[in-house]
Amino acid sequence: MTLSFLDQFASQSFLGIPLIAIAILIPWMLFPSPYKRWMSNRLITFQSWFIARTTNQLMLPLNTGAHKWAMILTALLLFLMTLNLLGLLPYTFTPTTQLSMNMALAVPLWLATVLIGMRNQPTHSLAHLLPEGTPTPLIPILIIIETISLFIRPLALGVRLTANLTAGHLLIQLISTATFVMLSIMPTIATLTFIVLALLTILEIAVAMIQAYVLVLLLSLYLQENV
């Protein structure tokens, strides 16, 4: 029976343990709930500090009216960051490498920012379609260009996250395959490629966290224009 390379990700169990149970337990272990004690442990303290720090950074450039989005943006950041980091584990599938999922997250949130602007301050929101000081003959062209750029925003959010994560996973796959193949033929070269693989994995951990932050940061900037 011939199996494709991607069939290894379709396994329903690993070492006799259902993968659905592991998939449910790992996020629960990463984000423990606080308990009623005078002093929290180090993990909960770090978790609370990280969430508070991230929320402050996201809400810093926004006015008071946009602070009600703090919970949504912070939850989205933690959700994307968790999926990106878990996707770096061997033999795991990364949902955020799928454009359909990223677009399903980006389009509704982008549309919500646009609708809020059109409802609360339509004149200010429509003013973004025409830069100040535009010559009269260029007004129709610039309005069309700005409208197209407005509708491209959610596509750019989804494609950016998908492309960066997919490229990193492909590089890790290629270098790890080369390391495994050359291990018995050229051990010295295999050692060098393994070092490159370790450095690339560290880089991909940083990319996984940065790309989640960039997507949420851009959403907060879009929100700033309409609130």
UniProtKB/Swiss-Prot annotation:
One of its GO terms (cellular component) is mitochondrial inner membrane. Keywords: ATP synthesis, CF(0), Hydrogen ion transport, Ion transport, Membrane, Mitochondrion, Mitochondrion inner membrane, Transmembrane, Transmembrane helix, Transport. GO terms for biological process: proton motive force-driven ATP synthesis; proton transmembrane transport. It is found in: Mitochondrion inner membrane. It is a multi-pass membrane protein. Belongs to the ATPase A chain family. Subunit a, of the mitochondrial membrane ATP synthase complex (F(1)F(0) ATP synthase or Complex V) that produces ATP from ADP in the presence of a proton gradient across the membrane which is generated by electron transport complexes of the respiratory chain. ATP synthase complex consist of a soluble F(1) head domain - the catalytic core - and a membrane F(1) domain - the membrane proton channel. These two domains are linked by a central stalk rotating inside the F(1) region and a stationary peripheral stalk. Component of the ATP synthase complex composed at least of ATP5F1A/subunit alpha, ATP5F1B/subunit beta, ATP5MC1/subunit c (homooctomer), MT-ATP6/subunit a, MT-ATP8/subunit 8, ATP5ME/subunit e, ATP5MF/subunit f, ATP5MG/subunit g, ATP5MK/subunit k, ATP5MJ/subunit j, ATP5F1C/subunit gamma, ATP5F1D/subunit delta, ATP5F1E/subunit epsilon, ATP5PF/subunit F6, ATP5PB/subunit b, ATP5PD/subunit d, ATP5PO/subunit OSCP. This is ATP synthase F(0) complex subunit a.
